[in-house]
Amino acid sequence: MSKQLHARKNNFPRNLKTQHDIFARNVEFLKDQILMEEFKKNKDRMIPWTQVKIRGAKFIMVAPESLEDLTIEGSRMRHCVASYAKQVAEGHTNILFMRDKEDPETSLVTVEVKPDHRINEDGEVTYTVWQAKQADNVRITPEQDQYLRKWADKLGFSVSGYL
């Protein structure tokens, strides 16, 4: 009878593993799309932070434009900043890049800024510069530290002892 109906005896795909892999890849792609949308919403918070100017400073702060920027930064700096992508997208932490003003495309220092979950007198969430590292997780230089502290002070951010 199944021959007459031209029905297959086995209703599973010919290659179940291939079908599974395609489905799993599509699920990961959807998760990545959702993460990217969350990142886009949360990255706007960092834009004003990058517009703070420190007189006479040779550095600037740059916000990542995409999650891919975190991967590129991690690769250039040989550290794990890409593993923070989900936390950044969900707004649990923020990552910025300190660059030389004359060479803003070259990685210099990666900076993590975390919300304190406290509210200041203006009703805004407060933030702490949690960590800042050069390539290979090397400590920042005194000059970079001085810039970062001035930048944080202008924004009303505190600075952790992990610098």
Where would I find each of the regions flagged by the language model?
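Catalytic-core elements of nucleic-acid end-processing and repair enzymes
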Residues: 1-163
